[in-house]
Design a protein with these regions (language model features):
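Internal helix-loop-helix
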Residues: 57-118
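Long, well-ordered alpha-helical segments
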Residues: 25, 31-32, 112-116
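Short acidic (Asp/Glu) and glycine-rich catalytic loops that position anionic groups and cofactors
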Residues: 6-8, 34, 59-64
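Residue-level recognition of alpha-helical structural elements
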Residues: 18, 43-47, 117
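Short secondary-structure junction/hinge motifs that connect adjacent elements
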Residues: 27-58, 68-72
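Short hydrophobic/aromatic segments of transmembrane alpha-helices and their interfaces
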Residues: 6-8, 43, 52, 99-100
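Intrinsic disorder at enzyme termini
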Residues: 1-25
Length: 119
């Protein structure tokens, strides 16, 4: 990933459906994303590297509720939107890697069997 000199616009976080937690969360994530230097010349390896980095950074914990090791008591669609928007701003591949992790884990925690949820 090439470091960006652009600054992610965050004015929209003043909209009433975002709360103070979202407003505090977004710049932390933006700083983290800007600090990642993942070589994306091999997209398959870069996806693995992004998943590792997202996991190590704790960002994948937003894909499941706290009862399953997640960051928040329940899935927060607004936090997920901020995550995806911010990652995509810095690297579309980072957003893709995050989305692929969340698609399965989020659905399983919402509608999976007890056995699936414990895995």
């Amino acid at each position: 990933m090439q470091p960006t000199t652009l600054t992610l616009p965050l004015q929209h976080l003043q909209l009433p459906f975002f709360d103070d937690a979202h407003r505090a969360f977004a710049p932390v994530l933006a700083r983290w994303a800007a600090a990642q230097h993942i070589d994306e010349s091999d997209d398959r390896q870069a996806c693995r590297d992004w998943v590792r980095a997202l996991g190590a950074g704790g960002w994948l914990r937003y894909c499941v509720p706290a009862g399953f090791g997640g960051a928040l008591p329940q899935l927060d669609s607004r936090a997920l939107v901020i995550l995806r928007e911010t990652l995509a701003f810095h690297s579309p591949l980072a957003d893709f890697a995050f989305a692929m992790q969340g698609l399965g884990s989020g659905a399983i925690t919402l509608a999976g069997t007890s056995e699936q949820r414990t895995q």
